[in-house]
Amino acid sequence: MRRREFVIIPIGALGGSLLRSLAEPLDRIARVEVANALATLPLRFFTAAEARIVTAACERVFPRDEQGPGATDAGVVVYIDRQLAGPYGRDKYRYTKPPFGPSSAEHGYQGAENPRALYRNGIRQLGAFDTMPVTEQIAALKAIEKTPFFALLRAHTLEGMFCDPVHGGNENLSGWKMVGFPGPLMDYRAHVDAHYGEAWRPAPKSLEQVTGRRFAPWEEERG
């Protein structure tokens, strides 16, 4: 199974042999490597302990393997931390008055808890997730896969893998390089003649690289 297919199926649908194969890549990632990376992160919402748990959970959702980098490599936890630190995290833009209907694929999460609370409560449910063996981590995520927290975690992991780096994730354009996305290129005319007849694909460029401008975090991420 390709990793692109994995991210669109629920954890409960995975068989035992596949779970073992997904466990192997994380076993090869030294935990000290993750700890060292987190030690230098400019966290705005998570505590260091929470960031370790979220990083480990995101890596289970999108693990590093022979096909490419994982959530840890892409700095997904930074993306999530920035989102939760800003107005999105406190539900500034979502209608939050009861009564609340059932959540659905069409309407999304329906409930009183804002994203910050969903994460804080979800992290408590996961316990010492970052120190668990991989098989136990998978079991822990299977136990919560029907919850709003897991739906949010999974969505945020994918967003952090493939967003523009200005938002905090997709470090070194690792997500775009993996899928061959060139970034927000505005015009290909200059390349047509130079590469006519070739199976050519431009190297990915971020919004800042394309425009030559520096961008500050937008209002959603400033808090």
Residue ranges of model-derived segments:
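C-terminal segment of N-terminal export signals and the immediately downstream linker at the start
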Residues: 17-56
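Short amphipathic alpha-helical interaction patches enriched in hydrophobic/aromatic residues
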Residues: 61, 65-66
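Generic, well-ordered alpha-helical scaffold segments in large soluble proteins
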Residues: 9-13, 60, 156
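N-terminal export signals
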Residues: 5-27, 133
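Short, mixed-charge, low-aromatic patches
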Residues: 8, 12-13, 31-38, 81
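Mature-region segments of soluble proteins
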Residues: 38-39, 49-56, 67-223
